[in-house]
Every structure is written in structure tokens, then in C-alpha cells.
From Swiss-Prot:
The keyword ATP-binding applies. Keywords: ATP-binding, Chaperone, Nucleotide-binding. Belongs to the heat shock protein 70 family. Disulfide bonds: none annotated. GO terms for molecular function: ATP binding; ATP hydrolysis activity; ATP-dependent protein folding chaperone; unfolded protein binding. This is Chaperone protein HscA homolog. NCBIfam families: HscA, PRK05183.1. Chaperone involved in the maturation of iron-sulfur cluster-containing proteins. Has a low intrinsic ATPase activity which is markedly stimulated by HscB. One of its GO terms (biological process) is iron-sulfur cluster assembly. InterPro entries: ATPase_NBD, Heat_shock_70_CS, HscA_NBD, HSP70_C_sf, HSP70_peptide-bd_sf, Hsp_70_fam, ISC_FeS_clus_asmbl_HscA.
């Protein structure tokens, strides 16, 4: 369904006026722009018939250049030429320096710990660099289409977290773009293939670009796209192939680059060699004083561990989707790195079928984004295409005992809103802390903290009387907002989740793997924590009752007996024997049965005091 546009009277567009919208594949290595023109989806080309725009910005003393012109400066002025900024976006400086120690840039930390790149034009954040690329693409598109853009759809890796998605939107706003939607790259590819060829069934989208890897398992049925599961690695791509090959060449030449210029030249040589080996079984290489031959077989051996790593992620995605390999009808290849013959061969063997490559893997994402942009801008009001993305990691809340209650499970279709009701743990409690978590584990300590906020103004009541409704809402861009509301007073508080930096690939992998490898231990830990919470509640209830009525209805011996059982349960609660704690709760319940009966009688006596029989009857 297209979005309706509202305008002032007399200022509405002509009923059939075509609004200009484009899809932008904002890639790690290269970017592309595509648009629907005269019913045909096309990638926009420059004057030299080139579609790929290098995702590179050069900050010179006099001017700023973007794209091919900037790329030519990479070996001449590497410290002021920013390449692969997408890898840096949404990450902390510490993370960047740990993960990418060989980058030629001079970094400093911003006030919030994010990286700033020192250039001749001042300090630049990855968001600003991305904004410069998007501004360039915007001007290029408007020049080619002959008018102002009404909106854009920008693609992002499916594994981008909230911080990385928000940073991408911030970059687009800096560039003056109207973002209709952020779209997962594999989903964009599914749109391009699904609509053009009318395929139905379960498909796998294998997306290996310059800097990121994504796998999505999708079901296509009668125009409905549903993402069954996603997986990926935010630090695996063709750039890593280049680095491995560059290191190998340097070893063969017995020469280590002495400065940033030589390092950049070596990486450029590695990239050229990789491309050549996609066409030939061997190629000549010259570096420093060394000249030799590199074979495709040698290159395959170098990259085999990385390709296997991607296939392990594919296996997990299939398991998450609940489908077997033989159920996959088609495998779509996306990203320039899928041109490597070894990658296509290994993916084909893994899924047991020849991958689809009929659409240029460099262009397929941009083409799908253009189709979606054309719909969202209102050019296809009758379109019946339905697009369903998913939440890649479960979203939950901390509960008593350090436990995690999942509100939105992993792989839930978005946009989505889910609500759950909670209550107070203590008598007279007037505030509640809401701790938002991300991950698959059962305990808070094993999940990722996304943010906290406090709901204040809860009416003081006995424990368990107040009702707080907590709502989690994920929008179409994968951004999360959380609201907590006390139902009787309607008082509420909320938070928009914008983490200060993104997940590392180790954290992403751990979150997915650990929920399976630690499932038994996690469940035992959860059951122990729940038993401790029950013990705490029982102890608090009994102590409160003793304070109110104990002295009035119990003898000294009875009082001491209950206190002894409380002390015993407190001691048991410190241990790890769940069954012993459960027995301690039962023993305390048994010891307080007489007390409970006496309290009930006392309450009845107080209620009937001073009343005549006929008043009661």
C-alpha cells in the first residue's frame, strides 16, 4: 500500500504525475543508485557508462571529492582518503582500533567515544563521511533524472544494529534526503528477483559484499515476502579477501610495506589480482622487487576459512528458519564478492543447487530498493506487494532475580509492537526501573544492555497490586522504542533505543551461538534464579505479616519457630541447590499455616466487632 500525500488546497500534484524516487545501495566498497523509469528498473550510469560509485571521500586542502576521483587519491594521500566508512559507522573508537589496526587514518575520540578521522578539512565522523557520499549520489541522481527527488530507500546489511541504522539515517538527513525507508540488503535482492521472475517458495539470499556478509532465508508466496530468518557477519567481505591476498604477496616478496602509501598500493594490487583470478586460472603479480604467479587454487586456499565461516552462518540461519537445505528452491547471489568462482562453487555445493546470478550481483540490491522506493513514494498505489522484515535478535526486559523476559522474540516480523504487564515487587513501591536487553540468553549478565529508564509516580500499594504495561515497538527501520505505563494513573515513561556504538562480530556470533551451546546450563540457572525469587517473596510476605500481627496472635515459641524457618531459608537461598530451596519454601509455608489461620480469625473478629447479629445476617 502506498503512502497518501496531503497538500494544501490547489497545491496537489497532478493525479498521474510521476514522483522521482531512487533506491540507494550504500555499500562498503561501492555504492549504486537505481530508479524506475517508464516502468523499467534501471541503475543510473555516469557519462562513461559506469554504475559503481566508489564509497570513498577525499578531503583535500582546497576541495572535497567523492567517488572515482576520490579513489584515485587513495594511494597518493591515504590519511585524507576515507574508504569503507560503512565499517566504522555506529562503532566506538576502541572497537575500531581493535578491529582495524592497519587503517591509515589518524583517529581521535568524540565526546561520546565515537571515532573522528583527522583530515585536512577537520575532524570527520563516519556519519559525516557517509553523508558526503549520499550528497554526491543525490546530486548525481537529480542530474540524471532531471528533477528533485521526492524520497529515497537506502539499503543496510540485515545485521546492522540500532546504532548503525540510526547513524545511517542521520547521515541521510545531513545529506538533505527524505528517507522513505531503510531496507535490508537481502530483502531488496528478494524484491528484485521475486517480482521480476515471479518465483514462489523458500529462497536463500547469500550476500557477500566488500565489508559485510548477510544470509537471509525468505518465503515468497503470491506476492508476499516473508523473511524467515537472518544471519550475518558485520566484518566479513571482499575486503578481507584482499587483506589475506595482500599479506600473502608481501610474504612472497619478503617485503613489509613501510608506510601508508605502500600499504594502499599493496591492497590495490591485491584487489586487481582477485578480479583477474575470477576470469583466469592464474595471473602475474609484481610487487617491490618480486615478480611471480598467483593461481586461483592458491587464492582459494587463502580464502577457504572465510568462505567456510560464511557457510556456518548459513547453516544457523536454516536452523532458525526451521527449514532443511533441500527445501531451498533458489539461491540468490548478491554482492561483488560472489563473482569469485570459489564462492559460487562452495555455495552451490552447500545448498545443492546452482546459485542464481542472472541479475548483476553488484546491481540487484539497488534495483530492489528502487522498486520499493517507487511504491513508497506513491507511484504504484495499486501494488499488492507486502514486505515483512524480522528482528534479528530477541528484545527483552530484566525481571527479578536477574532474569530476562523476552518481549519480542528473534525473527519476529517487523514492524511490530508487543506489550506485557508487570507488577511491583515491594510494598509501597512508587518507581520501577526498566532495563531493555538484547540477546538469546536467560540471564541479564549474558545479554546486551540497550538502555534503561525509570517509571515514577506509581501509586503506593501492596506488592503485586499495581499493574505496569510495558510496550516494545520496532519500526520498519528496525529501531526500537519502549514505553512503560501504570494503568490506573496512566503515568508513563519511554525511551528510544540508540546505543552509543554497534555490536562487534564476536558479540553477534556469541549471541546466536551461546543460546544453543548453553541452553541446558541457562535453563538450570533460570530455574535456580526463579526459585530464589519465590523464596524472597515468601520471606518478605511472612516478615510483613509478623510485623503486623505476629505479636498479637503468636506465642513466643511460635514466633521463634517461624523466625528459625526464615533464617534457614535465607541460608539455603545463598546456595545453588534448587531442590533444597524449594523444600525450604515448603517448610516455611508449613510452619506458618497456624499463623495464617490465626490471622484470618483475627481479621474476622475485627470486622465483626461492635456489630449486631441482625446487621451481619
Amino acid at each position: 500500500m502506498a503512502l497518501l500525500q496531503i497538500a494544501e488546497p490547489g497545491q496537489t500534484a497532478a493525479p498521474h504525475q510521476h514522483r522521482l524516487a531512487v533506491g540507494i545501495d550504500l555499500g562498503t566498497t561501492n555504492s549504486l543508485v537505481a530508479s524506475v523509469r517508464s516502468g523499467q528498473t534501471q541503475v543510473l550510469l555516469d557519462d562513461q557508462e559506469r554504475a559503481l560509485v566508489p564509497s570513498v571521500v577525499h578531503y583535500g586542502e582546497q576541495q572535497k571529492t567523492v567517488g572515482i576521483e576520490a579513489f584515485t587519491q587513495a594511494s597518493l594521500d591515504p590519511q585524507n582518503t576515507v574508504i569503507s566508512a560503512k565499517r566504522l559507522i555506529g562503532r566506538s573508537l576502541a572497537d575500531v582500533q581493535t578491529r582495524y589496526p592497519d587503517l591509515p587514518y589518524q583517529f581521535i575520540a568524540s565526546d561520546n567515544g565515537l571515532p573522528l578521522i583527522q583530515t585536512k578539512q577537520g575532524n570527520k565522523s563516519p556519519v559525516e563521511v557517509s553523508a558526503d557520499i549520499l550528497s554526491h549520489l543525490n546530486r548525481f541522481a537529480e542530474q540524471r533524472l532531471g528533477g528533485e527527488l521526492s524520497g529515497v530507500v537506502i539499503t543496510v546489511p540485515a545485521y546492522f544494529d540500532d546504532a548503525q541504522r540510526q547513524s545511517t539515517k542521520d547521515a541521510a538527513r545531513l545529506a538533505g534526503l527524505n528517507v522513505l525507508r531503510l531496507l535490508n540488503e537481502p530483502t531488496a535482492a528478494a524484491i528484485a528477483y521475486g517480482l521480476d521472475s515471479g518465483q514462489e517458495g523458500v529462497i536463500a539470499v547469500y550476500d557477500l559484499g566488500g565489508g559485510t556478509f548477510d544470509i537471509s532465508i525468505l518465503r515468497l508466496s503470491r506476492g508476499v515476502f516473508e523473511v524467515l530468518a537472518t544471519g550475518g557477519d558485520t566484518a566479513l567481505g571482499g575486503d578481507d579477501f584482499d587483506h589475506l591476498l595482500a599479506d600473502w604477496i608481501a610474504q612472497q616478496a619478503n617485503y613489509k610495506p613501510q608506510n601508508a602509501n605502500e600499504q594502499r598500493e599493496l591492497l590495490t594490487l591485491a584487489t586487481q589480482t582477485k578480479v583477474a583470478l575470477s576470469q583466469a586460472v592464474e595471473t602475474e603479480v609484481k610487487f617491490a622487487n618480486w615478480q611471480g604467479t598467483v593461481s586461483r587454487e592458491q587464492f582459494n586456499e587463502l580464502i577457504q576459512p572465510l568462505v567456510k565461516r560464511s557457510l556456518m552462518t548459513c547453516r544457523r540461519a536454516l536452523k532458525d528458519a526451521g527449514v532443511e537445505g533441500e527445501e531451498i528452491r533458489e539461491v540468490v547471489m548478491v554482492g561483488g564478492s560472489t563473482r569469485v568462482p570459489f564462492v559460487r562453487e562452495q555455495v552451490g555445493e552447500f545448498f545443492g543447487k546452482q546459485p542464481l546470478t542472472s541479475i548483476d550481483p553488484d546491481k540487484v540490491v539497488a534495483l530492489g530498493a528502487a522498486i520499493q522506493a517507487d511504491i513508497l513514494v506513491g507511484n504504484k498505489p495499486d501494488s499488492e506487494m507486502l514486505l515483512l522484515d524480522v528482528v534479528p535478535l530477541s528484545l527483552g526486559i530484566e525481571t527479578m532475580g536477574g532474569l530476562v523476559e523476552k518481549i519480542i522474540p528473534r525473527n519476529t516480523t517487523i514492524p511490530v509492537a508487543r506489550a506485557q504487564e508487570f507488577t511491583t515487587a515491594k510494598d509501597g513501591q512508587t518507581a520501577m526501573s526498566v532495563h531493555v536487553l538484547q540477546g538469546e540468553r536467560e540471564l541479564v549478565e549474558d545479554c546486551r544492555s540497550l538502555g534503561r529508564f525509570t517509571l515514577r509516580g506509581i501509586p503506593p500499594m501492596v506488592a503485586g497490586a499495581a499493574t505496569i504495561r510495558v510496550t516494545y515497538q520496532v519500526d520498519a527501520d528496525g529501531l526500537l522504542s519502549v514505553t512503560a505505563m501504570e494503568k490506573s494513573t496512566k503515568v508513563q515513561a519511554s525511551i528510544q533505543i540508540k546505543p552509543s556504538y554497534g555490536l562487534t562480530d564476536e558479540e553477534v556470533t556469541q549471541m546466536i551461538k551461546s543460546s544453543m551451546t548453553n541452553a541446558k546450563e541457562d535453563m538450570e540457572a533460570r530455574q535456580l534464579a526463579e526459585q530464589r525469587v519465590e523464596a524472597d517473596r515468601t520471606i518478605d510476605t511472612v516478615i510483613s505479616a509478623l510485623q503486623q500481627d505476629g505479636a498479637e496472635v503468636l506465642s513466643v515459641e511460635e514466633f521463634k519457630l517461624i523466625e528459625a524457618e526464615i533464617a534457614k531459608l535465607i541460608q539455603l537461598k545463598q546456595g545453588t541447590d534448587r531442590q533444597a530451596i524449594a523444600q525450604g519454601v515448603k517448610d516455611l509455608d508449613l510452619a506458618t499455616q497456624t499463623f495464617a489461620a490465626k490471622r484470618m480469625n483475627l481479621s474476622i473478629q475485627k470486622a465483626l466487632a461492635g456489630k449486631a447479629v441482625d446487621e451481619i445476617i
